[in-house]
A protein has these predicted regions:
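Short, ordered loop/turn segments at secondary-structure junctions
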Residues: 41, 133-134
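P-loop NTP-binding catalytic core
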Residues: 56, 67-132
Length: 134
């Protein structure tokens, strides 16, 4: 069974502040990246399965957040947005005035070639609950 993983990471990186984008692009293990946290006034952080990495020595500014929000577009009522034709999810944290004060950018990945393991169950047409780590 051959698996391929598609993450379209470049599409997610394209909406990030330049210094954050460059830090991630230069990492050898960027394929393992789980999420990027951009909180106002704090250092940007990349989260990997076994570690967390500071992505810049400059704290996230209002301009950084506004730029990302502008490139992403509209957030839903649940304060989430996506990037077209990808599985990436961006969650916004807002203050009481409704201003975005933080963004968590979750890397979405499609794993192709794995359905063979459960094809017979899927083809039964019944409900299935699949659990896994977030």
């Amino acid at each position: 069974m051959r698996q391929t993983i598609t993450d379209d990471l470049d599409a997610l990186l394209a909406v990030l502040p330049l210094r954050v984008r460059e830090a991630i692009a230069g990492m050898e293990d960027r394929a393992e990246l789980l999420e990027i946290v951009l909180d106002l006034g704090r250092l940007p952080e990349g989260r990997f399965p076994q570690r967390e990495v500071i992505l810049s020595d400059s704290p996230i500014s209002r301009e950084d957040l506004d730029g990302v929000v502008e490139r992403i577009g509209r957030f839903g009522d649940d304060n989430r947005a996506g990037i077209g034709r990808t599985l990436h999810r961006i969650s916004a944290i807002r203050n009481r005035r409704g201003e975005v004060v933080g963004l968590t950018c979750r890397v979405g990945r499609a794993v192709r070639g794995t359905v063979a393991l459960i094809r017979d169950v899927v083809e039964q047409g019944r409900s299935i609950l699949i659990l896994g780590r977030p």
